[in-house]
Amino acid sequence: YNVLEQAAIIPPNLNRIKRARRIFEDIRELEDAYNLSPTGEFPQSVYDYEQHIWKLQEEENNHALLAHMYVRHFGELHGGQMIKKKIPGNGLMYEFDGDTKELIEKFRELLDDSMAEEAKKCFDFASQLFDELSKEMENETVDI
């Protein structure tokens, strides 16, 4: 989220869509609550996604970056409300300031059909990440 939010040009009236700071706060909260200390590398798909986002920024393809923001951030807005009820911690990443209907409407004004292919790529990267995490979980036992 941090890389995406740095790369995309977000209109000032939509800055409240940003999640990176809240995600960081959620991670810190869970680290403290469960005495966790993250170790190891991220799955390869995280690095692949990051490279893809920076490539779009280098190409000045803000339209494509906004497609990724729509998929990721509005997934948190919609499905995240259910997830928040089921996870430990405050789940700040799922909280959006202000009128969410207005936020959705204003962001959708930036979208068009030409962004569909890039939105699909965003889903593909997410699927790749979930596959990698599933394989890792098969090989590890985590005590919380």
Task: Show the residue positions of the predicted features.
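Metal- and O2-centered redox machinery and metal/ROS homeostasis
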Residues: Y1-I144
